[in-house]
């Protein structure tokens, strides 16, 4: 995703019919008023600096109970395919791991980088799909392949939107 309001745009696009549980970096949850509002909106925190077992367990709990978890595959904001540190962006394996372990589908979503305030943003929601793995729980290599496929699907949605 490319800016801070992407989760808000997506939550508004799907409406109340598809309540999403967004995952946000833990630093946001510690901001006095914002953190309270995010918690009330169903957002849960992830500590991005390490494998956050609590966030993973929370996401698994939500998915197994039929809720929808919103996370961005790159794990950070990206502009022009480059993260804020100047590195080429690549998908993390979190979405793949959660889908494999819970049996939940992955829904690719394209949100354009260029948005105008107080204007409609054309968000493209792809078809849900279930990633395939050979091993029972999936391996790191399988998760990486699934994450790469997810990014390919997102880019294909972006090409359709253009």
Stretches with model-predicted labels:
Residues 1-50:
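Catalytic core of membrane glycerolipid acyltransferases/transacylases, capturing the structured
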Residues 56-162:
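Non-catalytic C-terminal accessory region of glycerolipid acyltransferases
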Residues 2, 51, 142, 146:
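Soluble or luminal CAZymes and related metallo-dependent hydrolases
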Residues 28, 52, 77-79:
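Acidic, metal-coordinating catalytic cores used for nucleic-acid/nucleotide bond scission
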């Amino acid at each position: 995703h490319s800016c801070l309001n992407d989760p808000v745009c997506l939550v508004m696009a799907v409406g109340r019919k598809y309540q999403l549980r967004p995952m946000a970096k833990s630093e946001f949850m510690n901001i006095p008023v914002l953190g309270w509002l995010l918690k009330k909106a169903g957002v849960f925190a992830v500590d991005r600096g390490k494998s956050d077992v609590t966030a993973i367990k929370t996401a698994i709990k939500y998915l197994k109970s039929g809720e929808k978890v919103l996370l961005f595959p790159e794990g950070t904001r990206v502009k022009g395919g480059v993260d804020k540190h100047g590195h080429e962006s690549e998908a993390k394996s979190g979405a793949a791991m959660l889908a494999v372990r819970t049996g939940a589908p992955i829904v690719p979503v394209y949100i354009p980088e260029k948005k105008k305030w107080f204007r409609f943003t054309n968000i493209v929601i792809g078809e849900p799909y279930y990633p395939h793995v050979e091993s029972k729980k999936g391996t790191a290599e399988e998760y990486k392949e699934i994450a790469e496929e997810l990014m390919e699907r997102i880019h294909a949605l972006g090409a359709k939107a253009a």
